[in-house]
Amino acid sequence: MKALRRFTVRAHLPERLAALDQLSTNLRWSWDKPTQDLFAAIDPALWEQCGHDPVALLGAVNPARLDELALDAEFLGALDELAADLNDYLSRPLWYQEQQDAGVAAQALPTGIAYFSLEFGVAEVLPNYSGGLGILAGDHLKSASDLGVPLIAVGLYYRSGYFRQSLTADGWQHETYPSLDPQGLPLRLLTDANGDPVLVEVALGDNAVLRARIWVAQVGRVPLLLLDSDIPENEHDLRNVTDRLYGGDQEHRIKQEILAGIGGVRAIRAYTAVEKLTPPEVFHMNEGHAGFLGIERIRELVTDAGLDFDTALTVVRSSTVFTTHTPVPAGIDRFPLEMVQRYVNDQRGDGRSRLLPGLPADRIVALGAEDDPAKFNMAHMGLRLAQRANGVSLLHGRVSRAMFNELWAGFDPDEVPIGSVTNGVHAPTWAAPQWLQLGRELAGSDSLREPVVWQRLHQVDPAHLWWIRSQLRSMLVEDVRARLRQSWLERGATDAELGWIATAFDPNVLTVGFARRVPTYKRLTLMLRDPGRLEQLLLDEQRPIQLIVAGKSHPADDGGKALIQQVVRFADRPQFRHRIAFLPNYDMSMARLLYWGCDVWLNNPLRPLEACGTSGMKSALNGGLNLSIRDGWWDEWYDGENGWEIPSADGVADENRRDDLEAGALYDLLAQAVAPKFYERDERGVPQRWVEMVRHTLQTLGPKVLASRMVRDYVEHYYAPAAQSFRRTAGAQFDAARELADYRRRAEEAWPKIEIADVDSTGLPDTPLLGSQLTLTATVRLAGLRPNDVTVQGVLGRVDSGDVLMDPVTVEMAHTGTGDGGYEIFSTTTPLPLAGPVGYTVRVLPRHPMLAASNELGLVTLA
C-alpha cells in the first residue's frame, strides 16, 4: 500500500555529537573527503545504502549507535577537529578578503554579488540540475566559497528534482520523477523573528498571487536560496509552478521564470534583512531564464527611490552581468508576445503593470523585442538589462557576438560588446582522491589552485602516474559492471543470463568515455556511423578499445531517445557487449568515476554548437586525454600534445556527408594515433609516450580548467567593474544615473539626424608607402549634440574585392572647429598601418564617461 504523505524525521543527536548537524547540512562536506570519511565511519554499510547522504544517514542510523559514538574518544576527536576546520573555513580570510586588504584596487570589489540560475548541481543529494548549466552553476558557488567571494545564489526548489532515467527492454528511455522532501535534504527554511516562514509574493494578474517560501542550502560560505511554490497559501495550479525542472508548457515555464527573477530579487531582500546582511551590489544572470530580475530591480528604484524608468534602467544596467550559454537562437527562451503581455500589461486601466507596479507595461515588453514581432526574447532582455555580457569560451564569445549582432546594427560582429570567460570546474569535487593525495605529497597541499602542485609534476616517476591512471580505470570498470547488472535486471533480465558481466570490460584496455546530454548537435551516434569499423576497434586482438556511453534525453525529445536506443541496441549485441555499454541515469556520482577512469574523453559536436563542454575539462583534470572536435574550450586550449583534434568538415553543407567525413576521421585517429600510443610499453609495462601526454595535460590544462580561475576572472573583469559602475550611478542621490539617462535620451533622439556630410583625405604621396601620413577631415552634423558628446573615428583596414574593411584599425579624430551651417569639423593625421589594398571610412559614436564602451548603446553613423 502507498503512503498518503511522505515526510522525513531526523534523529535526535546526543549533545556531544551536535556538531554532526552543522557538518551534515553545510554542503561543504560534498567536496571535503575527511568529512565524508567521518560520516562513513558512523555506519559504513548504511552510508553506502544512503547514497553518501549525511542527512539521510543521520535519519536512519540506530540511536544506540549514536550513543556509542558519543563515548568514542577517537570519533569525538575527529568530529571536533572537523567541526573546528569547518568553522575556520567559514570565517578565515580567503583570496577575496586578501584582495580587499591589498589596497586601492580592492575598493572596486563588490560587497556582495547575487547569482541567479534555474538549476544548480552542487551535490548528488540535491538533484536540482539537468546538465552542464546546472553543474557549472554548482561549481561556480563552490569555487566562490573557496575563494571567499561574497555570493548569494538564487534558484527554484523543484519538488521532483530531475528525472531518473532507466531503459525498457528494447532500449527506450523511461523517466521517473523522485519526490523530494525538503525536510530530508540539507536545507533550512528561512523564517522571520517570530519563527514564521518568510514568503515572497508575485502578482500574476486576474487577482492571482504566486507565493513561495525560501529554502536555504548552505554551500560552504555561499547561501543558495531556493524558492518553493508548493505551499497551502497558493491555489492548486500555482502550487505546481516549481514541480519540475524544465517541465510543462510555456505557460508553466514563464511562471517559473517570473518567480525566479522577480521572486528571486524579493527573496534576496528578505534574506539579507533577516540575516542583517548588506544587499548585493552586482547581479549576475546565468542565462536569460532569470531576466525578470532586472525589471524587478527597476521597479524597486521607481517605487522606492522615486526614479523615472530610464534612470532606474541605467542603475540596473550598470550593476548587471549577463552570461549566455547557448550558441544557437533555438537555445534561447522565446515566449509568445501576447503571453508576456498578459502578465505585464495594463491590469488597472492606467497603463501600469500589475506584475511590476509602477512600471509602464510597454517599456517592459520592449526590452524583449526581437526581429519576430510576435516573440519576446529572454536573451535580448538580458542583454538590454546588462552593461556587461559574456560567452563561456573564446570561441563561444565570437559565436555570441555574431548571433546577437542585430542588437548592435551597424557594428561588425567583432565589435559587439560581449566578451568571454571560459568555464572551469571545481577541482575538489571532480579530481580523484589519488590526485589530491599526490598534491599533498608534492606541495603539502591538496589545493590544486596552488601552481606549485602542477609545476612539480615533472618530479613524478612515469610509473607512478601510470599506476594512478590504472587504479582509476580499475575502479571505473568495477562500477560499470555493477551498473550494467542493475540496468539489465531493470530491463527484465535474470541473474542466470548475466554471468558475462563478471568479465565485461577490462581494467587493462584503453577506455573511452562519452557522456553528456543528448541534443542532436552533440551527435551521440556519430560513433555508430560505420558499425563495421567500430566493431574492428572494439574487438582488435592487439589494441582493443572499450567504450562507455551515458546521457539523458529531454523527456519530450523523442529524437534524442531514438539516438539512445540506437546505441543501446548496438551495445546489447552479444559479440561486443563486453566492450561497449550505455549506462542509464547519468548523474554526478556516475560522472565522477567516468572522469576519473576514462583514458580518453570523446566529444564530437557539430562545430561551433558546443558553447564550452566542461566534461572534457573534468577528464583532463584527472589525466584523461581529450579526443574532440575543435569546439568550445578545446578550440582555445588544444596544443597538439594534450590530446587529439578530430578534423571538422565545417564547410560541407550536406549533413550526412559531414558526419561521414568526421566519423571516418574519428575512427582513423583511434586506430592510428590513440590506440598505438596507449599500447606501446617499455620494459616496465609503462606506455611512456602516453604518460608524457598525461603529464603534459595535467601541467598545462590543470591550472586553466579550474573554476577558481573562472570565478577570479568574473571578479576581476566583470564583478569589480560592475560594482564601480553601480557606485557611480547610485551615488549622490543617483545624479550620475540621471545624467547618463538624460544623455542616452538626447543621443537616441538626435542619432537618426546625425550626418557625416563630407570626408576629405590629404597628405598621401602619389604612391603611398607603409607609414605614409594620411590626414582625414570629416564634416559632421550633430543634430543638437555637442562635440564632446560623440566620438568621431577614422577606420582603416585592408579591403576585400567588395571594398569591405578587414581587420580594421580605429583612430580617434579631434574636434578642430565649427564650419558653415553649424557643421562640426573633426580631423586626424595617422601613419598608414597596413600594406596592400587599403581603405578607410569615418563613423560617429556616442561618448560619455559612464558608458562601459562607445558601442554600448548600439548607436553608430557611418560615412
Curated annotation (Swiss-Prot):
Cofactor (UniProt): pyridoxal 5'-phosphate
Classification via SUPFAM superfamilies: UDP-Glycosyltransferase/glycogen phosphorylase
Molecular function via GO: glycogen phosphorylase activity; pyridoxal phosphate binding
Cited PROSITE patterns: PHOSPHORYLASE
Organism domain of life: Bacteria
Modified residues (N6-(pyridoxal phosphate)lysine): 618
Enzyme type, top EC level: transferase
Recorded catalytic activity of this chain's protein: [(1->4)-alpha-D-glucosyl](n) + phosphate = [(1->4)-alpha-D-glucosyl](n-1) + alpha-D-glucose 1-phosphate
GO biological process, one term: glycogen metabolic process
Disulfide-bond pairs as recorded: none
Transferase as UniProt keyword: yes
Family statement: Belongs to the glycogen phosphorylase family.
Function: Phosphorylase is an important allosteric enzyme in carbohydrate metabolism. Enzymes from different sources differ in their regulatory mechanisms and in their natural substrates. However, all known phosphorylases share catalytic and structural properties.
Name this polypeptide is given: Glycogen phosphorylase
Species name: Mycobacterium bovis (strain ATCC BAA-935 / AF2122/97)
Gene field: glgP
